[in-house]
């Protein structure tokens, strides 16, 4: 049985969240009555309001109104007044992933999983399917620049979704195709240990039906280890690894555009398909790898090489994924969501490949718990930056941990051999410091999952005011 149109008014608690807003938008576009609430106004809230969705700012029991179904994310605590009121009324309370799963039942579904690269890969798969005329429905964990939103309703038979592994609920998603970009020891507060993370991703792939398949990155040791353990399901491997079914190679840079070749080898028939000179308007081998995952999916769905090449060449990127916010005195300023050492290292390596000058990295650590558990990795992930500015930790509601702070990170980075790491007192100090460092041709890359995105947006103007230009 699929979800009927007669479920009544659906209320989203925390509707402005990047995951919740996409589901609410698609549900609204399907003709369901949708409303919601959020702690504060935001771009996502404004966008949904413009579509006619009623949204209250602040959480109060009366916000429920005539709601018959309530959707919550894991960020909503049990003492939320709207959640309490919903349970007092005996209303069905649905987790975000459960509602996403219900939407997926209306389409053939592609779910993109992995501890890093999900959002970009989801966007790339959507872009290629668009270029192939498949007009997919998309629910992503980031704003796709080509759409100006993180969700869109397509008329085609395919849906592309980002599968969030953080709370284990991605195992509820009924995917026909499951992509795994990588597996790192993240979200151990939920899983308890890394073995449980490994087991979850294996289950994610084995959950696909017998007529579906998994698409797994052979370059990542944990994913490669999992490939041999997948039982009774079809698997397509991708990556730079010479053993991959879909292999990228001959990577070169044309300015900030990655140019590369892809070789597709069919195991059963021995057929080899060569796609040469693919162009992706993003730097970085990690982005080439993500693009190769999208190529693997698109080619298996029957897309022609010309459409694949067109889709990659016109890819508009994702908001907060190496997004140019402006320029000053010949230096380019970028905003990036990277907040894990693996992500930071990949972004800075990509910047190094594309930049003719020096790299100035500005990082706002996100959560004391993450900085504590990955402290050594954070100390060694900035090597491609010439100068590092470390801002105070964005706590995200956490309590401070003794000895775990930004100054300690700066000291550790220096102890590990970096020549120029500095503590940045806060956003008010950013422009004055950068104005003394940045030179024509340099890249200033702001990295983090907290408020640093606002600093990146404001920095070009603040620098111009300092210089009087």
Curated annotation (Swiss-Prot):
This is UDP-N-acetylmuramate--L-alanine ligase. ATP binds at residues 114-120. It catalyses: UDP-N-acetyl-alpha-D-muramate + L-alanine + ATP = UDP-N-acetyl-alpha-D-muramoyl-L-alanine + ADP + phosphate + H(+). It is an enzyme of class 6 (ligase). One of its GO terms (cellular component) is cytoplasm. It comes from Sinorhizobium fredii (strain NBRC 101917 / NGR234). Keywords: ATP-binding, Cell cycle, Cell division, Cell shape, Cell wall biogenesis/degradation, Cytoplasm, Ligase, Nucleotide-binding, Peptidoglycan synthesis. Pfam families: Mur_ligase, Mur_ligase_C, Mur_ligase_M. Its EC number is 6.3.2.8. The keyword ATP-binding applies. It is found in: Cytoplasm. GO terms for molecular function: ATP binding; UDP-N-acetylmuramate-L-alanine ligase activity. InterPro entries: Mur-like_cat_sf, Mur_ligase_C, Mur_ligase_C_dom_sf, Mur_ligase_cen, Mur_ligase_N, MurCDEF_pg_biosynth, UDP-N-AcMur_Ala_ligase_MurC. PANTHER family: UDP-N-ACETYLMURAMATE--L-ALANINE LIGASE, UDP-N-ACETYLMURAMATE--L-ALANINE LIGASE-RELATED. GO terms for biological process: cell division; cell wall organization; peptidoglycan biosynthetic process; regulation of cell shape. Belongs to the MurCDEF family. Pathway: Cell wall biogenesis; peptidoglycan biosynthesis. Cell wall formation.
